[in-house]
A protein has these predicted regions:
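Catalytic alpha/beta core domains of metabolic enzymes, predominantly
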Residues: 133-134, 145-247, 251
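Structured C-terminal cap/extension of enzyme domains
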Residues: 202-306
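Active-site beta->alpha loop and helix N-cap motifs at the rims of alpha/beta catalytic domains
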Residues: 2-149, 159, 299
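A general structural signal for well-ordered alpha-helical segments in protein cores
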Residues: 33, 65, 69, 94, ...
Length: 306
């Protein structure tokens, strides 16, 4: 077990991959975003990740991304770090987004691997280095091959770890062996980006998690990490088991995490081509959530977002 004091966690342990609230007409709702962010911080989140996969970033404009960041910064102040998602198939646009995020008040950048064109690893490395050199912000590299079509290979991460502003990885690669090797060989802070792997990755030395489930169950996730850090691994495993039914429905049911999180929160529509969860899926999510509250203690849920 990795002692808490030996973990490198530049953005905190438990980060929420925050949804992006929209109004009933589909417009960005910065006020609702601010309320949700403040509730997440009150319920134990150490940091917030905006404009990521759960935040429907492919459907928001550059201006909306900046407005969301400013609204959340105004709501939470300097209490927690805010990491802004950037990235795409165009290095120039990614750099523009990174500089915009820095101006809007981000504390770090979540930089997704360049998707669609599927460049070779040498080009992937160059892409990340160019973004890292473009601002003064620390980078969390986002390895999510199911969405991008390419891995950020462990060997590439080992080389990038030498860059002074490459400090962390959001790991959605489902490669526990590869992740463990990089954790052991570098000072990169690993964050689980797949809720079902939060505890396994934490057990092998990860810094924490960037969680979709944290939108609705932040206190339970905080309790899991606290139990593990206190040496009570049995309690951490128990909480993890209790979270599993909800985690499965939210992240592995075939519905995107943002759809399921918004269904539970009543957080407004998703943007097309995504579609809202149906009645049956929503009812199942609510049953799993109520069961979680019953078995873990009725923690206050995040403030509903109109």
């Amino acid at each position: 077990m990795t002692a808490p004091e030996t973990r490198t966690a530049p953005f905190g342990r438990m980060l929420c991959a925050m949804i992006t609230p929209f109004t009933s007409s589909g417009a960005l709702d910065p006020d609702a975003a601010g309320r949700h962010a403040a509730a997440l911080v009150a319920d134990g989140c150490d940091g917030l990740v905006l404009n990521g996969t759960t935040g429907e970033s492919p459907t928001t404009t550059d201006a909306e991304k900046a407005a969301l960041l400013r609204a959340v910064r105004a709501a939470v102040g300097d209490r927690v770090p805010i990491v802004a998602g950037v990235g795409g198939p165009d290095t120039r646009h990614t750099i523009d987004l990174a500089r915009q995020a820095e101006r809007a008040g981000a504390d770090g950048l979540l930089v997704v691997a360049p998707y669609y064109s599927r460049p070779p690893q040498a080009a992937v490395e160059t892409y990340f280095r160019r973004v890292a050199d473009a601002t003064g912000l620390p980078l969390m590299l986002y390895d999510i091959p199911d969405r991008t079509g390419i891995r950020v290979e462990p060997e590439t991460l080992l080389r990038l770890a030498g860059h002074p502003r490459v400090v962390a990885v959001k790991d959605c690669a489902y490669d526990l062996l590869g992740s463990t090797k990089v954790i052991g060989a570098t000072s990169l802070a690993y964050y689980s980006g797949c809720d079902e792997l939060n505890l396994p990755l934490y057990a092998v030395g990860a810094a924490g998690c960037v969680s979709t489930v944290a939108n609705v169950a932040p206190r339970q996730l905080r309790a899991l990490l606290d139990a593990f850090d206190a040496g009570n691994t049995a309690e951490a495993a128990r909480i993890n088991r209790l979270l599993t039914p909800l985690t499965e429905l939210m992240t592995a049911s075939g519905l995107p995490g943002t759809v399921t999180a918004k269904a539970l929160l009543g957080a407004g529509p998703v943007r097309e081509p995504l579609q809202p969860a149906g009645r049956g899926a929503t009812d199942g999510l609510r049953r799993a959530y109520e069961e979680l509250l019953t078995t873990t203690g009725r923690c206050p849920s995040p403030a509903p977002v109109p």
